[in-house]
């Protein structure tokens, strides 16, 4: 299977795992060893501004815009770890380029910049991540658990989390509710 890096996984309507039900996961890494991604449509009920205060990263005097974005549950693995998906900027301590439109940073310095003129233009903050071991994701796709689409910055950064699953399914080009949950091979 080709790499699904910079793709969205869209949970099938028949997925009965309450944690991943109606989830959209942005795949940050996918290779022969496994996959890592962030769920991008499940708010935890905390605003980014409140998270920064809890971390004692108070808004700087250069604060230039309002923070009304929500912190998301990235997945069940390492829920104490924070991740920021953002538009490209190269000056963070621990950043990885995922695509020409998206980077992943897991260092505290990016959080300290949020809300200032040094902040990335667009960002998503998540706690925890979703991970798959070797061949696990491929098997879940074969089992009809996930559908995939190429990620777009518009969907990642400009759609409210609560609307993302519906918007992502509309990108598929067919009515997802018409799909069978049965898997088979002719």
Swiss-Prot record:
Gene3D superfamilies: VC0467-like. Transmembrane segments: none annotated. One of its GO terms (cellular component) is cytosol. Pfam families: DUF179. InterPro entries: AlgH-like (IPR003774). It comes from the Bacteria. Belongs to the UPF0301 (AlgH) family. This is UPF0301 protein Sfri_2850. It comes from Shewanella frigidimarina (strain NCIMB 400). The lineage of its organism: Bacteria, Pseudomonadati, Pseudomonadota, Gammaproteobacteria, Alteromonadales.
């Amino acid at each position: 299977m080709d790499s699904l890096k910079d793709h969205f996984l869209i949970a099938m309507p028949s997925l009965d795992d309450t944690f991943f039900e109606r989830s959209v996961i942005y795949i940050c890494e996918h290779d022969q060893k496994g996959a890592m991604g962030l769920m991008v449509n499940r708010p935890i009920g905390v605003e980014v501004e409140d998270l920064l205060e809890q971390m004692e990263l108070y808004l700087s005097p250069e604060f230039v815009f309002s923070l009304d974005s929500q912190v998301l549950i990235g997945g069940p693995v390492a829920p104490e770890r924070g991740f920021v998906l953002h538009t490209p900027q190269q000056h963070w301590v621990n950043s990885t380029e995922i695509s020409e439109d998206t980077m992943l940073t897991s260092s505290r310095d990016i959080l300290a910049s949020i809300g200032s003129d040094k902040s990335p233009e667009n960002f998503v903050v998540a706690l925890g991540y979703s991970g798959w071991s070797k061949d696990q994701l491929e098997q879940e796709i074969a089992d009809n658990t996930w559908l995939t689409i190429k990620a777009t910055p518009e969907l990642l950064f400009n759609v409210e989390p609560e609307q993302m699953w519906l918007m992502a399914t509309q990108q598929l080009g067919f009515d997802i509710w018409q799909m069978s949950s049965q898997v088979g091979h002719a």
